[in-house]
């Protein structure tokens, strides 16, 4: 495996991505093109949770996927999250397509994975980047490449559905209402989705994921949805690997199944397949 940190630019604003590239397997008679996952971690739009970066990357590397971690635009005193975050996703996808000469990449099998706030970015991208009018409006047409599917883990979907808790916080994320309700951006062209959450999520109510799943169904977009009966927000792997020290509430045997469930789903939709 090769780990690479790369500075990219979107609208002249630099940002960093970390790529985990699989090495070719010498035993194979010919190079095998592998799918790519791009991870947008959570953190309430104010930081990027490291519990949702490398531990997740290692799981999907083991399934034969190259993995990139994208620390998308956060909200701060001078910046809103949108639309810059979507431009960063688009530029990252484009950069992946530019690496085919260096790595064995299948550019038709790029998966976006978002946790919590990162799920809001990914869900919005899945709608806006597949809508020709909005692609032009937000200047996403300047980038090459497209994603094939998305995975959402306890995602923020609707900024009026429990997180954030005030209108002031919502406006710090973005004042552009196009991004407030990701479910309303879903179109018939959106990509297939795997979504999971817990019914007892105390920070981002499960209504968020439900709204998105219903929107996908309305537009006949393939979706697999798992709502686990109990568990806190921010479980990540839900195992000892991502457990915060001394806090057993981050252990959840039921929810920890999501990696194998998502891998099975990726196999079903032919993102992961036999060589």
Provide a role label for each language-model segment.
Residues 1-32, 165, 254:
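N-terminal cap/lid segment of alpha/beta-hydrolase-fold proteins
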Residues 49-50, 70-107:
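Catalytic nucleophile-loop/oxyanion-hole region of alpha/beta-hydrolase
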Residues 202-211:
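Conserved alpha/beta-hydrolase "acid-adjacent" motif
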Residues 217-275:
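C-terminal catalytic histidine-bearing segment of alpha/beta-hydrolase fold enzymes
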């Amino acid at each position: 495996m090769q780990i690479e940190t790369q500075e990219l630019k979107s609208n002249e604003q630099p940002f960093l991505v970390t790529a985990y590239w699989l090495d070719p397997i010498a035993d194979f008679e010919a190079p095998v093109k592998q799918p790519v996952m791009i991870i947008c971690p959570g953190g309430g739009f104010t930081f990027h949770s490291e519990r949702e970066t490398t531990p997740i990357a290692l799981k999907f590397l083991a399934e034969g996927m190259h993995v990139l971690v994208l620390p998308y635009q956060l909200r701060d005193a001078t910046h809103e999250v949108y639309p810059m975050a979507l431009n960063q996703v688009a530029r990252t996808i484009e950069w992946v397509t530019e690496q085919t000469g260096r790595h064995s990449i299948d550019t038709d099998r790029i998966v976006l994975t978002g946790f919590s706030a990162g799920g809001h970015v990914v869900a919005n991208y899945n709608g806006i980047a597949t809508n020709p009018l909005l692609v032009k409006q937000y200047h996403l047409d300047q980038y090459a490449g497209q994603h094939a599917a998305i995975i959402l883990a306890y995602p923020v979907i609707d900024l009026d559905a429990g997180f954030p808790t005030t209108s002031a916080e919502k406006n710090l994320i973005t004042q552009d209402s196009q991004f407030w309700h990701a479910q309303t951006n879903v179109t018939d062209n959106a990509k297939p989705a795997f979504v999971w959450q817990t019914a007892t999520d105390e920070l981002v109510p499960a209504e968020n994921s439900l709204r998105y799943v219903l929107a996908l169904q309305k537009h006949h977009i393939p979706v697999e949805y798992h709502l686990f009966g109990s568990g806190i927000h921010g479980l990540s792997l839900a195992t000892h690997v991502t457990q915060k020290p001394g806090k057993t509430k981050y252990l959840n045997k039921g929810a920890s199944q999501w990696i194998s469930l998502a891998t099975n789903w990726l196999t079903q939709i032919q993102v992961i397949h036999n060589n």
